[in-house]
Amino acid sequence: MERITDVLCDLAKSYIEAGLDSVYFASLGGETCFFTDEEFEKWIKPFDLRIMKAIKDAGGYCFLHICKDGLNMERYRCYAPYADVVNWGVFEVPYDMEEGRELFGGKTLMGGLPNRHGVLVDGTHEQVEEEVKRVIADFGRKGLILGADCTLATEQDLEKVKQAVKTARSC
């Protein structure tokens, strides 16, 4: 774990030195079916925090993505000082945006839209527009980067993504 973490810290530093502004850091291991709280504390958290600190120390912004479902989100509370933006599967965990705002001490959150079902997958352009307006009205613009829970499918209709962007910019 030490070697892997050292390499990822060096890689993060190299990204920032090469001119990137930020690193999207995906944290795995918060799933309760794989690790106990004690195992997470020993085998996941210290290495995650070292990598996130390396991103910050290099002068970059750290986008923390907490990956997968079945998470114990409380395990990530102490990650807040190292994250500039936090993202997770709001519709998969479930852990809503307001709960995340509290958990991460008001950090900017990225999300609001599901990536595997819902308006981005099978909605009309009008439904995309309505959902984006609802998310922004419910959460507010401050501290929100509108986005999906996780990676969009390769077959994603990009016209729906464009509609979401257009709507968000007009709100």
For every predicted segment, state its role.
Residues 1-171:
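Active-site loop segments of alpha/beta catalytic cores
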